[in-house]
From Swiss-Prot:
PANTHER family documented for this protein: NADH-QUINONE OXIDOREDUCTASE SUBUNIT A, NADH-UBIQUINONE OXIDOREDUCTASE CHAIN 3
EC number(s) stated in the UniProt entry for this protein: 7.1.1.-
UniProt KW keywords: Cell inner membrane, Cell membrane, Membrane, NAD, Quinone, Translocase, Transmembrane, Transmembrane helix, Transport, Ubiquinone
Subunit text: NDH-1 is composed of 13 different subunits. Subunits NuoA, H, J, K, L, M, N constitute the membrane sector of the complex.
Gene3D superfamilies according to UniProt: NADH:ubiquinone/plastoquinone oxidoreductase, chain 3
Taxonomy of the source species: Bacteria, Pseudomonadati, Pseudomonadota, Gammaproteobacteria, Enterobacterales
Encoding gene per record: nuoA
HAMAP family, alphabetized: NDH1_NuoA
Substrates-to-products reaction catalysed: a quinone + NADH + 5 H(+)(in) = a quinol + NAD(+) + 4 H(+)(out)
Similarity comment text for this entry: Belongs to the complex I subunit 3 family.
Keyword Membrane annotated: yes
One GO cellular component term noted in the UniProt record for this chain: NADH dehydrogenase complex
The protein's name: NADH-quinone oxidoreductase subunit A
Protein purpose: NDH-1 shuttles electrons from NADH, via FMN and iron-sulfur (Fe-S) centers, to quinones in the respiratory chain. The immediate electron acceptor for the enzyme in this species is believed to be ubiquinone. Couples the redox reaction to proton translocation (for every two electrons transferred, four hydrogen ions are translocated across the cytoplasmic membrane), and thus conserves the redox energy in a proton gradient.
Length: 150
């Protein structure tokens, strides 16, 4: 069991680093606050457009597909981190770790197959996997009253 003095003696460098980093950030923020200019005009809240008057709204509507791509990136990035951690400790984990990683990869592949099957990865609506029954022209032509039946 280590005493408080031993813990402090062991971690003093990290404490100094942490205090220095927080102090430096605070010093930069205070310096910017005191040395920065103050705009008191009406144009203070208008974005700077390189000397050109801004036209229209700055808000832009993005397609939900971009959000899906961002979520997929985060999901697969976290999965890559797990696999990297496993690959670093492959000797310590042995066959049990290999089996766990294989199951993890199979679950990921099942999720990817599911995303492909529901069409979540399709960018165009024409390529979606939904089956829509298209009415045939012959069916409508035969039911039209002006077209004679054979």
């Amino acid at each position: 069991m280590s005493t408080t003095t031993e813990v402090i003696a062991h971690h003093w460098a990290f404490a100094v680093f942490l205090i220095g980093a927080i102090g430096l950030c605070g010093l930069m923020l205070l310096g910017a606050f005191f040395l920065g200019g103050r705009a008191r005009a009406r144009a203070k809240n208008v974005p700077y457009e390189s000397g050109i008057d801004s036209v229209g709204s700055a808000r832009m509507r993005l397609s939900a597909k971009f959000y899906l791509v961002a979520m997929f990136f985060v999901i697969f990035d976290v999965e890559a981190l797990y696999l990297y951690a496993w690959s670093i400790s492959i000797r310590e984990s042995g066959w049990i770790g290999f089996i766990e990683a294989t199951i993890f990869i199979l679950v990921l592949l099942a999720g990817l197959v599911y995303l492909v099957r529901i069409g979540a990865l399709d960018w165009t609506p024409g390529r979606s996997n939904r089956r829509v029954s298209k009415p045939s022209i012959v069916k409508y032509a035969s039911s039209h009253p002006d077209i004679p039946k054979n």
